[in-house]
UniProtKB/Swiss-Prot annotation:
E.C. designation(s): 1.14.16.1
Keyword hit for Metal-binding: yes
Identification of the protein by name: Phenylalanine-4-hydroxylase
Enzyme class: oxidoreductase
GO molecular function: iron ion binding; phenylalanine 4-monooxygenase activity
Presence of the UniProt keyword Membrane in the record: no
Family membership noted in the UniProt record: Belongs to the biopterin-dependent aromatic amino acid hydroxylase family.
GO terms of biological process kind: L-phenylalanine catabolic process
Designated gene of the protein: phhA
Residues that coordinate or bind Fe cation: H129, H134, E175
Reaction catalysed by this enzyme: (6R)-L-erythro-5,6,7,8-tetrahydrobiopterin + L-phenylalanine + O2 = (4aS,6R)-4a-hydroxy-L-erythro-5,6,7,8-tetrahydrobiopterin + L-tyrosine
Length: 294
């Protein structure tokens, strides 16, 4: 839920840290019904697609209860498991605010839910993307530590002027990451698990490249926010993310300053290519060719 730049102060009605009350009691039945529709169609298809850590998190937080979750309820279990809580925010928050929340084990989640006609695509993350997509993974201790470390690293990246590189790491792991498991590729990224169409595309479509995770490679790679990804990076396990947090990012930023960015569809020497994509979807015009990302 991060926006751009530094905070110039919260909007009216928000606290200094940009949080607001969730106002769970104000949701209408129609809004609860949207959650139920989204939840049921995602969980029906995610078995055998989402990683075990995500599926265990769904169960641990009892997110299958009917309707939009009450943050106060899920926070009791989440805090017990990993020390994290979910806090409501009015929308995208500035980068410095976002990093501060993560560094203190608070995940900022949008309070609103999409309209019924927006089930398959929404430009700004809503409560379904943020809570269904992100929060189950926060029940895993290793992933929870990674997210806190990311927040701490974000504050340093802002000071060094390397936010673009760090944002790519978040994008290609937390939002659109895949994992190699003994049972095959599995999804752990929130942008995929919360999207019916991208849950299929990311694993099954021949279009995108699927490349083994390499930290510096990921931090050099551009990304697109308007459609399916043209490349997915694949970790071997959640432990890979723990290893990332132990790296000297200062030295990495120095090296990245002297090399060029990598395009979204490029394969470069040294890549561990799992799937060399056809890029047919992007070449045909992406969503304009008939497929919708959600």
């Amino acid at each position: 839920m991060s926006g751009d730049g530094l905070s110039n102060g919260p909007p009216p009605g928000a606290r200094p840290d940009w949080t607001i009350d969730q106002g769970w009691e104000t949701y209408t039945q129609a809004e609860h019904d949207v959650w139920i529709t989204l939840y049921e169609r995602q969980t029906d298809m995610l078995h055998g697609r989402a990683c075990d850590e995500f599926m265990r998190g769904l169960d641990a937080l009892d997110l299958h209860r009917s309707g939009i979750p009450d943050f106060a309820r899920i926070n009791e279990e989440l805090k017990r498991l990993t020390g994290w809580t979910v806090v409501a925010v009015p929308g995208l928050v500035p980068d410095d605010v976002f990093f501060d929340h993560l560094a203190n084990r608070r995940f900022p989640a949008g309070q609103f839910i999409r309209k019924p006609h927006e089930l398959d695509y929404l430009q700004e993350p809503d409560i379904f993307h943020d809570v269904f997509g992100h929060v189950p993974m926060l029940t895993d201790p290793v992933f929870a530590d990674y997210m806190q470390a990311y927040g701490e690293g974000g504050r340093r990246a802002l000071g060094l002027g390397r936010l673009a590189n760090l944002a790519r790491l978040y994008w290609y792991t937390v939002e659109f990451g895949l994992m190699n498991t003994p049972a095959g590729l599995r999804i752990y990224g929130a942008g995929i698990v919360s999207s019916r169409t991208e849950s299929i595309f990311a694993l099954d479509d021949p279009s995108p490249n699927r490349i083994g995770f390499d930290l510096e490679r990921v931090m050099r790679t551009l990304y697109r926010i308007d459609d399916f990804q043209q490349v997915y990076f694949v970790i071997d396990s959640i432990q890979t993310l723990q290893e990332v947090t132990l790296r000297d990012f200062g030295a990495i930023y120095e090296r990245l300053a002297s090399v060029s960015d990598i395009g979204v569809a490029e394969i470069v020497p040294g890549d561990a290519v799992l799937t060399r994509g056809t890029q047919a979807y992007a070449t045909a015009g992406g969503r304009l060719a008939g497929a919708a990302a959600g």
